[in-house]
């Protein structure tokens, strides 16, 4: 997914980026500040190895509390945990970045990044896609 709320509505399906683009659009339409967050889930039963890729969630602002996480895609997969995922995330999450349409520091010459989870490189100002995209972890 690309985090496109209109696509998610039209297709009636999507991955976590689409679910949370839709949630963020709904929250903002009601005047509730909301933002996109992305990272990975580290399997708690293992002490090292790789993980399958990224996972994202949304956060919305509540005065007096701050940013509250929501994981609508996990709640959809596990309806019995829907209440939990509206305000909590599992402890195995590692957050990488927040926001969309990102400009890096120093700024990339290419367009803003839809979201930033994988290594990004440019050759002569052109995005280079030949970068290895994998995640590995180990207990320290």
Predicted ranges, named:
Residues 21-109:
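Hydrophobic/aromatic-rich core segments of domains that either
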Residues 15-19:
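Long, well-ordered mid-to-C-terminal structural blocks that present hydrophobic/aromatic surfaces
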Residues 1-14:
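Short, conserved helix/loop micro-motifs enriched in His/Cys and acidic residues
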Residues 64-68, 96-140:
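N-terminal accessory/pre-domain segments preceding catalytic cores
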Residues 11, 59, 88, 127-129:
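Alpha-helical protein-protein interaction elements
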């Amino acid at each position: 997914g690309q985090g496109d709320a209109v696509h998610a509505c039209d297709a009636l399906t999507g991955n976590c980026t689409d679910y949370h683009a839709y949630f963020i659009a709904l929250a903002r339409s009601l005047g509730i500040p909301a933002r996109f967050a992305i990272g990975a889930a580290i399997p708690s039963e293992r002490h090292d190895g790789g993980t399958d890729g990224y996972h994202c969630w949304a956060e919305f602002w509540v005065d007096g509390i701050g940013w509250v996480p929501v994981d609508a895609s996990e709640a959809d997969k596990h309806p019995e945990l829907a209440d939990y995922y509206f305000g909590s995330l599992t402890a195995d999450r590692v957050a990488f970045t927040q926001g969309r349409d990102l400009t890096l520091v120093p700024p990339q010459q290419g367009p803003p990044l839809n979201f930033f989870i994988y290594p990004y490189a440019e050759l002569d100002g052109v995005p280079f896609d030949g970068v290895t995209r994998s995640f590995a972890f180990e207990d320290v």
